C-alpha cells in the first residue's frame, strides 16, 4: 500500500488560496467594495452566477464557496454611461490602470483596474429593467431565479454558440447543475389555467422550419403519450393540457391540423430565413418585433403564422414522427418563459405551459429508464440519441456551410473591412449584414488625457434594439 497521502483536488479551496496570495489582493478587494457600493447606489440588478449564488444563500445553499471573490455581472438601462462613471470613481479613488472596454458580448462593458476585471455591465432596455422580478441580498438587487432560468435554457438551445468554446463543451454541465438548484429551491408553482381550444389547419414547408410554441407542445405531448403506450405504462392522471394533432405531407409541405389555445391561435415556426420562407409561402408580412434581450429573436408576423428568426445561429431541434422537425424542449421552455415576461396579462397561461413542458420531460425520463432496463446499452444509446426529450446537438440547417455568426464575429469582420479598406465580395453571405461599428460604444481610460466619450445612442444601433418592440411592416 502506498504511503503517499491522498491528493486533495478541491479546486475551489485552492482558488481561494490563490486569490488571497495575489500581490494586489488588497487593492482588488478594495476595488470590488467600490463596485458593490456603486451597484447599491445606482440600483443595478445582478445576474449570472453571482445572482444565482446570492439567491441560493437566501435558501441556505450556494454554488460558490464562502469567501470567494465576487464576479459582479449587472444589468443597467444605461450601461455605457454607468461603466464610464464607475471607471471615473475608481480612478478618483487612486486605483491604477483603470479602464472601460467593450466586451465580446456587444451589449456589455467591462471595467478593470490594474488589469483585473472588477465589473461587467450589460444593457437592459428600460421597459424590461423596470418590470423584471428581483430579490434583495445584503442591499443588492439580484435578478429573480424565475428570470435567470431563461439564460440557462438558452445555452441548451444553441449548442454551437460562442466558438471556439462552444456552449456544448463549456456550459452544458455547469448550467444543468445550476438549473437543478434553481428548480429545487425556487420551483414555479403549478397553477392550472383553463383554456379553450380551436382546431387550426396550416400548410408549412417540410424542411426549412421547426414547429414551435403551443403547436410544438402538442406534438411533444402526443409523442410522449405514444412512448407511454409502447412502454405499456398506464395512462397518467394530469391537469396539464393534452391537445391533439394530425398531419399529412408530401415532398415539400406538411398540412398540420392541431388544437391551439383560442388566445394564441397563430402557429409559431423557427427558421433561419424568415423573409425568404414568408415569400415562398406567399404570405403577407404584417409586423416585425425586435429581439427581447437574448431570450427571443426577431419575430416576423403574418396573419396566421409567426416566424422566429434563428439567422446567424444553429438552433437545436428534435425529430418526431415521420421526420417532423420540432424545436427542442429547451427552446420551448424558453418560449414559455419569454411569453410570461413579455405578456404579463397572460403570465399564468405561459407559466402553466412551462410547468407542463417540465412534466413532459419528467415523464419522458421515467420512460427512458424503463427502456434502458429492457434493452442493451448499444440499443438504448441509439434510441436515446434520437429521442426528442434529451439534450441534443442536432440543429436546424441553413443555406451555408457555416451558420453561426455571433455579433462579436460580425463586428470583428467589420473592423477588418474598415482597416483594410477592402469590402467583402458581394457574393459573401455577410456582405449586407455587417454592423456599423461607428455607432458602438467607445473604450475609455480615465487619466490618459482623452475626454470621456459622450452621447452614445442606443437607438442608432440595431444591436441594442432588444426591448421586444413590435412595429407594423411596410411590406
UniProtKB/Swiss-Prot annotation:
It comes from the Viruses. It holds the Pfam family Poly_A_pol_cat. Keywords: ATP-binding, Late protein, mRNA processing, Nucleotide-binding, Transcription, Transferase, Virion. Induction: Expressed in the late phase of the viral replicative cycle. It is found in: Virion. It catalyses: RNA(n) + ATP = RNA(n)-3'-adenine ribonucleotide + diphosphate. Its EC number is 2.7.7.19. GO terms for cellular component: virion component. One of its GO terms (molecular function) is ATP binding. InterPro entries: PolyA_pol_cat_su. GO terms for biological process: mRNA processing. CDD domains: polyA_pol_Asfar. It is an enzyme of class 2 (transferase). Polymerase that creates the 3'-poly(A) tail of mRNAs. Belongs to the poxviridae poly(A) polymerase catalytic subunit family. Highly divergent. This is Putative poly(A) polymerase catalytic subunit. It comes from African swine fever virus (isolate Warthog/Namibia/Wart80/1980) (ASFV).
